[in-house]
Amino acid sequence: MSQPPINPLGQPQVPAAASPSGQPSVVKRLKTSSTGLFKRFITVPDKYPKMRYVYDTGIIALAAIAILSILLTASGNSLMLYALAPALALGALGVTLLISDILDSPKAKKIGEAITAIVVPIIVLAIAAGLIAGAFVASSGTMLVFANPMFVMGLITVGLYFMSLNKLTLDYFRREHLLRMEKKTQETAEPILVTPSADDAKKIAVEKKKDLSASARMEEHEASQRQDARHRRIGREAQGSFFYSSRNPEHRRSFGSLSRFKTKPSDAASTRPASISPPFKDDFQPYHFKDLRSSSFGSGASSAFTPIMPASSRSPNFSTGTVLHPEPVYPKGGKEPSIPRVSSSSRRSPRDRQDKQQQQQNQDEEQKQQSKKKSGKSNQSLKTPPPDGKSTANLSPSNPFSDGYDEREKRKHRKNK
């Protein structure tokens, strides 16, 4: 498929007619140019680097011509001596530019900057000294030296010396000190700020791609599971029931509050020291403090349960939360074993507890003394033969643990009457 013609009407293309006006002159080009003549003159060294030396040398030459012409024209007594200040500044600028252009390498530039920072203030001070000395020579050492313009220019040049000393020399030394400190800091921090290895970079990339919200939810779920298992273990091993409810609504919604923990009677009887199971009753079930808390003998479900502390062999030492009163043990067929009485002493004062413990110790001592007396009498009765001539012990059917001592005493008392 051929392309359509550029001119579909078939008309020949007529070239544009040339402008009747002639070529623009040099003056018009300069006027319409985007850059001025002075700017082009200044930017010549940028286009041609070798022209820098020409410019620097020209600046120094102009400064020298200005200084010499001023000194010759003024003859040391004219106000034209005040023009020495800009001429001297122009000469110092030319010397500085020439030194910086000659030295191309970084090391050479560093040396040139050091020379400039040290030499320029010395040159300015020498000029000031020359001006002051010329003023003294012109005034023949009289008081007219203070009215001489050369002396005033010397004082102004001394001010320029201090300015150059501050701006060139001191700034150069400050910059060098900062560069040395920066280099020392980089050398010190380079071993610490090392680039990560390939494995470390891979781990960092994996950590960046990880879903932080999902990992946080997983950690929270695992923490709640560990807490739930810990409370279950405490409920199995502890001596009472525990109620737990989380303050976190999400945890409560996910797992719910923990109910009362229940254990088997066999496990509780073997692990808990609070269980009491006499060996003479086959169908007797051990009583646990968990059951006593809910029964009429306990202090109610609202009272706090305190685990029993180990007691000494001399006297029972129960916890302050509950007091356990011992009951006598009866043989099979006699009096039924009673449930241990549990009373709450959470509202008792420490003095009442001490009185109760003292009373308990006194009762224990009285029981021990009575048991010693009974054992002594039983030994005497065993040594003396019974009155009926039999050597066997006369056991009472009502009390199988008695040796008949009380019955014999009653008979003796009746005979004496």
UniProtKB/Swiss-Prot annotation:
Keywords: Cell membrane, Membrane, Transmembrane, Transmembrane helix. It comes from the Bacteria. InterPro entries: DUF5423, MFS_trans_sf. Residues 312-322, 391-401 have a biased composition (Polar residues). The chain crosses the membrane at residues 54-74, 79-99, 117-137, 143-163. It is a multi-pass membrane protein. GO terms for cellular component: plasma membrane. Residues 211-228 have a biased composition (Basic and acidic residues). The keyword Protein biosynthesis does not apply. Belongs to the chlamydial CPn_0443/CT_005/TC_0273 family. Residues 1-24, 211-283, 308-417 are annotated as: Disordered. It is found in: Cell membrane. Residues 336-347 have a biased composition (Low complexity). It holds the Pfam family DUF5423. This is Uncharacterized protein CPn_0443/CP_0310/CPj0443/CpB0459.
